[in-house]
């Protein structure tokens, strides 16, 4: 069975690994991963990696399930020898609001979810309500190299090439896995897919131990300041620009992030800036995770689409990888059935 995976962010690599681990032992797979960007140059590398879905219920209930599956999988890996290399760790912190809001759908997924006490709220005078919980941190800059190593150990080939069309890789391939994120629209028109530009500042601030996410409904999602400590640096953010394709770091956005994060946590004024990155979240009303049979002139192929994970790719990736593997299994079953001789009963 010949498989072409397009895209080498967290979605492409995890989907490839999940499928290879599940089916290669019984159905030898010849798998290639095509991408014009591999780690450390993917959108996933820019992400701070905090496991937290959006606050509102997803339009597709399956997305809540996929996020939960990802949390459960990562939690099961937490005490494995691989956790440190994966960039996986527990992390606790705050979600802050101006006014009281309903509890999120994921409150029972995370550990120790509770409302903030009045004395805790005194720490954040600009906010009137909040939550505290323990979650998981999965840093893309560690996790993507770890996934890549697992795949190459299994004999999966990585091909550094920009794929211009699905037809380009269809010849001689049984299944195409489309994990191209925000660039999926270049391979197949998708009016629902848009870039959600983000910009972050990375600082050295080892005294910051808790994440702090703020939420302002009037500004929209991701447009409020957030602070997420990682293993080596702290990520500062708060930019979400729908439809903006500019890959350049913006001085204006830098100033917005710096001013708002320093107001939220004044000790950051003493932090040394060590990096600044811009990336594009693949924004869609819901994840596209489905099969499609495509014909390309004389050739044809099964396609599994897995893209449109917005700003929560690391939060939902393994659940989506398992669902893509389920779809792949159905393709295998159908191919086996089609090869069976006709019954003469």
From Swiss-Prot:
Induction: Repressed in the small intestine during treatment of whole animal with the antibiotic vancomycin. Inhibited by benzoate and thiolactomycin. Inhibited by 6-chloro-1,2-benzisoxazol-3(2H)-one (CBIO) and luvadaxistat. Meso-tartrate has no effect on activity. It is an enzyme of class 1 (oxidoreductase). A motif (Microbody targeting signal) lies at residues 343-345. It is found in: Peroxisome matrix; Cytoplasm, Cytosol; Presynaptic active zone; Secreted. Transmembrane segments: none annotated. PROSITE patterns: DAO. Phosphorylated in the cerebellum; probably not by PRKACA, PRKCA or PRKCE. Pfam families: DAO (PF01266). GO terms for cellular component: cell projection; cytosol; extracellular space; mitochondrial outer membrane; peroxisomal matrix; peroxisome; presynaptic active zone. Its main location: other. GO terms for biological process: D-alanine catabolic process; D-serine catabolic process; digestion; dopamine biosynthetic process; killing by host of symbiont cells; L-leucine metabolic process; neutrophil-mediated killing of gram-negative bacterium; proline catabolic process. Keywords: Cell projection, Cytoplasm, FAD, Flavoprotein, Oxidoreductase, Peroxisome, Phosphoprotein, S-nitrosylation, Secreted, Synapse. It catalyses: a D-alpha-amino acid + O2 + H2O = a 2-oxocarboxylate + H2O2 + NH4(+); D-alanine + O2 + H2O = pyruvate + H2O2 + NH4(+); D-cysteine + O2 + H2O = 2-oxo-3-sulfanylpropanoate + H2O2 + NH4(+); D-dopa + O2 + H2O = 3-(3,4-dihydroxyphenyl)pyruvate + H2O2 + NH4(+). D-proline binds at residues 226, 281, 311. PANTHER family: D-AMINO ACID OXIDASE (PTHR11530), D-AMINO-ACID OXIDASE (PTHR11530:SF15). Interacts with BSN (via coiled region); the interaction is direct and inhibits DAO enzyme activity. This is D-amino-acid oxidase. It comes from Mus musculus (Mouse). The gene is Dao.
């Amino acid at each position: 069975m010949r498989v072409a995976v397009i895209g080498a962010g967290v979605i492409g690599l995890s989907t490839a690994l999940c499928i290879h681990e599940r089916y290669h032992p019984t159905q030898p797979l010849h798998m290639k991963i095509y991408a014009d960007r591999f780690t450390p140059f993917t959108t996933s590398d820019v992400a701070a990696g905090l496991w937290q879905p959006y606050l509102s219920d997803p339009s597709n209930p399956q997305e809540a399930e996929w996020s939960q599956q990802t949390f459960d999988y990562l939690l099961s890996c937490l005490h494995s020898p691989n956790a440190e290399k994966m960039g996986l760790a527990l992390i606790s912190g705050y979600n802050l609001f101006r006014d009281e809001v309903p509890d999120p759908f994921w409150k029972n997924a995370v550990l120790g979810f509770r409302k903030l006490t009045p004395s805790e709220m005194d720490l954040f005078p600009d906010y009137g309500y909040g939550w505290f919980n323990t979650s998981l941190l999965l840093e893309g800059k560690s996790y993507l190299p770890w996934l890549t190593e697992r795949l190459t150990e299994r004999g999966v080939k990585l091909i550094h090439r920009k794929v211009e069309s699905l037809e380009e890789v269809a010849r001689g391939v049984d299944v195409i896995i489309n994990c191209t994120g925000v660039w999926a629209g270049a391979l197949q028109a998708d009016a629902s897919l848009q870039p959600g530009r983000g910009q972050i500042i990375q600082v050295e601030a080892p005294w910051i131990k808790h994440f702090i996410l703020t939420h302002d409904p009037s500004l929209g999602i991701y447009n409020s300041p957030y602070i997420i400590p990682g293993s080596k640096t702290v990520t500062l953010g708060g930019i979400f620009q729908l439809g903006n394709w500019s890959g350049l770091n913006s001085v204006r956005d830098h100033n917005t992030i710096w001013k708002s994060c320093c107001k939220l946590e004044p000790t950051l004024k003493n932090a040394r800036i060590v990096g600044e990155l811009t990336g594009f979240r693949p924004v869609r009303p819901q994840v596209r995770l489905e099969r499609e049979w495509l014909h390309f002139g004389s050739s044809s192929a099964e396609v599994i689409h897995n893209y449109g994970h917005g700003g929560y790719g690391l939060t939902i990736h393994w659940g989506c990888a398992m669902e893509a593997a389920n779809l792949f299994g159905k393709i295998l079953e159908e191919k086996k059935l089609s090869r069976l001789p006709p019954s003469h009963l």
